[in-house]
Amino acid sequence: MAKIMIQGTASSVGKSLIVAALCRIFKQDGYSVCPFKSQNMSLNSYITLDGKEMGRAQVLQAYAAGLEPEVYMNPILLKPTSDKKCQIIVNGKVYGNSTAMGYHNLKLKFKNMLKGHFNKLEEDFDIVVMEGAGSPAEINLRDRDIVNMGMAELVDAPVLLVGDIDKGGVFASLAGTMLLLNEGEKKRVKGTIINKFRGDVEILKPGLDMLEDIIHIPCLGVVPYTRLQLEDEDGAVEFNKKAYAPIDIAVIKMPHISNFTDLDALKSEEDVSIRFITSKEEFKEPDLLVIPGSKNTIEDLLYLRKCGLEESIKEYSKDGKIIGICGGYQVLGSKIKDPHNVETDLGEIDGLNLLDMETTFEKEKVTTRVSAKLLNEETKNTVYGYEIHMGISKYGENIKPLFKIYDKNGEKVDYFDGAINEKGNVMGTYIHGVFDGVVFREKIINELRVKKGLKKKKSQMYEHMREKELDKLADIVRHSLDMEKIYSIIGMK
């Protein structure tokens, strides 16, 4: 089996998409390929067919490889709950909560497990494309590294180092990273990649030659800056502004925002523009307000209260349309109870009181794939998605459920999810990915179109668009990198 590891000079340099591109290229070339990231830190997660939790970046990479996402592609997922603490997910299930130092002391315990997963991949695939995290030059973490050079050494993988020229200082970041690696680590780096370049490559070439003279490693290509409709896991970045998009969707950007990839399908609609808001001054008059998921719902509810957005949301709810997803659904209720101190020691807190329901946080996390019917007079079509939450919500008298769940991890079930008020303009659900399918997205966006005097439109399947974008990404990267050299590095061709 062949393997290659993509590491970067920093977070957000484009490692994840380079891995996705290589997975699609190798697949196009007839090889069986699998992505692998030993440890990921992200609040964007996904539930596999067997009800296990993993990072969204490896989900996209799995699709690029033509595979169903599985937790062995991302055995360890860290989900920050505060600046100093995180929830540790191991093999798709909650391992526990820990401080940064506590997890640092735990890491070596997972080495054998990681090696076991990788050995299985060696048996099942022609090529494994690995991804590092952050930078390999975090010299204070070297002795317990299980995600960058430590992982590369564990499985004897060659490394390509990615630098982001769009941030500026790419030559210094590449040279500085190499300077801080030890001799054994330096030998693993077989090439560099300049990512997100804008302009004429000819102007860059003298710098590439000088860099090669300094670090004695060839540059394998310059990848142009490209806007693609593919999800970004590293942060809730501003969405691309569209020249003309009559439908304005505002999203509350809370401090602990999670699973904002739920919005990707919405931004695929040509006449929809999405913007984040962090203050009441930015609120304005959106056509739709989305309150997304949160890793700390109570803290984010307190944030809404403190910054004045609670007042703006309540005023908007009189005539505007609001959709809450997971944590965003919970804050719409009348009360949130936390008897086990899952998030805070407050015990309970009043919600926005826009939906007649209460949420109680339980000790066990719900992680499940679901299929649901939209409870609507016009359509009974299926919505697919997944749930990741600690809370159980109970309905009051003045409310209606939004969905009926009929399948949970492949088992037949029969229970309600979500809620909608009597007026029909405020609603919420626990289902992540609710907009990915056509049914719910088309219904909601067409309601907004009609309200603005626009014609209804048919929505396209998000996965079809994603496949086209992955092919486009692969084409760009294939023509930007020296693929013949990369095949030589991994011992293929």
Swiss-Prot record:
Arranged from A to Z, the UniProt key words for this protein are: Cobalamin biosynthesis, Glutamine amidotransferase
Supply the SUPFAM superfamilies for this chain.
Class I glutamine amidotransferase-like, P-loop containing nucleoside triphosphate hydrolases
* Catalytic residues (positions): C326 (nucleophile), H432
Q: Which residues form the GATase cobBQ-type domain?
A: 246-440
GO terms assigned for molecular function: ABC-type vitamin B12 transporter activity; catalytic activity
Gene Ontology terms: biological process: cobalamin biosynthetic process
Pfam families recorded: CbiA, GATase_3
Q: What pathway, per the record?
A: Cofactor biosynthesis; adenosylcobalamin biosynthesis
Gene3D superfamilies (alphabetical): 3.40.50.880, P-loop containing nucleotide triphosphate hydrolases (3.40.50.300)
The function of this protein is: Catalyzes amidations at positions B, D, E, and G on adenosylcobyrinic A,C-diamide. NH(2) groups are provided by glutamine, and one molecule of ATP is hydrogenolyzed for each amidation.
PANTHER family in alphabetical order: COBYRIC ACID SYNTHASE (PTHR21343:SF1), DETHIOBIOTIN SYNTHETASE (PTHR21343)
Q: Which family does it belong to?
A: Belongs to the CobB/CobQ family. CobQ subfamily.
Name of the protein this chain belongs to: Cobyric acid synthase
Species source reads Clostridium botulinum (strain Kyoto / Type A2)
